[in-house]
Amino acid sequence: MCGIVGYIGNEDAKEILLSGLEKLEYRGYDSAGIAVRTESDTEVFKEKGRIATLRKAVDENVHSTVGIGHTRWATHGVPSQLNAHPHQSATERYTLVHNGVIENYEQIKRDYLADVQLKSDTDTEVIVQFIEQLAGEGLTTEEAVSKALSLMKGSYAIALLDKDDPDTIFVGKNKSPLLVGVGENANVVASDAMAMLTVTDQFIEIMDEELVIVRRDRIEIKTLAGDVQERKPYTAELDVSDIEKGTYAHFMLKEIDEQPFVIRNIIQKYQHEDGSTRLDEDIRAAMKDSDRIYIVAAGTSYHAGLVGKQLLERVSGKPTEVHIASEFLYNMPLLSEKPLFVFISQSGETADSRGVLVNVKKQGHRTLTITNVPGSTLSREADYTLHTFAGPEIAVASTKAYTAQIAVLALLAVDVANAAGKTLDFDLLQELAIAANAMESLCNQKDEMEQIARDYLSVTRNAFFIGRTADYFVALEGALKLKEISYIQAEGFAGGELKHGTIALIEDGTPVIALATQEHVNLSIRGNVQEVASRGAATAIISMEGLDQEGDAVVLPRVHELLTPLVSVIPTQLIAYYAALHRGCDVDKPRNLAKSVTVE
């Protein structure tokens, strides 16, 4: 949610900032703005809507080599030009951008800013006005920022310009992601490394409650208490081409097509020279020592976790629970004696999951993160990390991260089984390779998927996905994808639950897409399809070779039953994509959604 960029160097700052913000569009936003330092002033440009609108508003004649930028996703105050960032202090000495939520901003207003007339409805403006108030009492900017941030409760990532110190960007962070990049004769600030890859691939992690003073030729990191911190940069292993669409119309379609290659990449990354799949010994020991696994996730990652539970229990025999992070945070169940917590997050920054992680670590429990972003908060703070190696996922609706998470969970399940001395009747790497081939075959059947979307979903307001066992998990994910990008009220249900209430919603023409890839429930789910068809539903069945019947809409290549979600999800993703396309929706940036949910 939201994105921050900052630049100080010798090049034209405004173009670097705008380009950086465009690379952060995937995070979701409703307004955007930049501020640049000229020889005599700080120029602020901000607009409601897309960055393309902001570009038109920026004065091309303004030249600057220092600036900050922001994409906003409203939390306090409606989306508007007034509430967009950057915000300025009363005298316009200070200009600030901020991600996060300041929980005690009303108290700060009452206690310190009673005589200050605020211009916006945001918590962000309180920060910049408070900093100016403190500076007016004789504190240096560094001291004022440190004191202000030390009194803030909640999450924040900030970048600040000071008109009286034009060659410095002040940066602070707590519970919200922010990086500082080290370049040649230039330094940058970014919520995500990909925003500033054109400037540098060398980045430094900022830790919670730290203040960073960024200048052209040096970077100083301090705690809010003033203690100097030394930290070397790491190399961001990203390629600029990874964050470009290439010949594709949308990132989502590109990322759907990348999934077979992601699975093959995971095989390569986790396969040893002898062909085995041994994970880190510490992870193996933690899994073996635990008496129950608690998977904690949100959204698409939660759906991957449901598949992971089945894999862990059926392959390794390890009892597993799956919990929605935001619910677990405030309604923790009774735990086993030796729990291991597995956090699944594409970004590694999900605020609800991090809240759970912090809580369970305080209780002394071990934690494992499965994420797509090395160096992310969850990967840094968990005891152990498994990377999914899916590459940057730009479209807001997750596709390749989901299948990558399932593949890594499958590897984890097999590794636990091997460590326990269990004999498995299948070769996971071979079965994953077969699944990747099947996924690639389905990605080449786009015309069929587009036809289903056109026939069933072009004008409907509602749609249902049904399945049983593993197919039910995919039904949940398929419904989420459809509602995310097409705005159709789509729901996923267990086939056996239809008669317990949901069937009352079936009308003439109601689209019902059924998944039928599980042999032991194949006839049962087909019976459910007949139930809704007899009440007027327009039905389409996604089945698998060997289980298919005449009239099935899509027949998947045969894969190992435990890995069917990797394959059966592809048609649901493509159907959602084409449904959104035909309905004129913004596929990559659906309304009201953020890619990385960094506030609760």
UniProtKB/Swiss-Prot annotation:
Entry GO terms, CC: cytosol
Record keywords: Aminotransferase, Cytoplasm, Glutamine amidotransferase, Repeat, Transferase
Active-site residues annotated for this sequence: 2 (nucleophile), 595 (for fru-6p isomerization activity)
Keyword Transferase: yes
GO biological process: carbohydrate metabolic process; fructose 6-phosphate metabolic process; protein N-linked glycosylation; UDP-N-acetylglucosamine metabolic process
EC number(s) on file: 2.6.1.16
Subcellular location: Cytoplasm
Major localisation: cytoplasm
PROSITE patterns named in the record: GATASE_TYPE_2, SIS
Gene Ontology terms for molecular function: carbohydrate derivative binding; glutamine-fructose-6-phosphate transaminase (isomerizing) activity
Residue ranges annotated for the SIS domain, each copy included: 283-422, 452-590
InterPro entries: GATase_2_dom, GFAT, GFAT_N, GlmS/AgaS_SIS, GlmS/FrlB_SIS, Ntn_hydrolases_N, SIS_dom, SIS_dom_sf
Transmembrane residue ranges: none
Residue ranges constituting the Glutamine amidotransferase type-2 domain according to the UniProt record: 2-217
Enzyme class of the recorded protein, top EC level: transferase
Record carries keyword Transferase: yes
Pfam families, per the entry: GATase_6, SIS
Catalytic activity from the UniProt record: D-fructose 6-phosphate + L-glutamine = D-glucosamine 6-phosphate + L-glutamate
Quaternary structure note: Homodimer.
NCBIfam families (UniProt xref): glmS, PRK00331.1
Function description: Catalyzes the first step in hexosamine metabolism, converting fructose-6P into glucosamine-6P using glutamine as a nitrogen source.
This protein's name: Glutamine--fructose-6-phosphate aminotransferase [isomerizing]
Species of provenance: Shouchella clausii (strain KSM-K16) (Alkalihalobacillus clausii)
The gene coding this protein: glmS
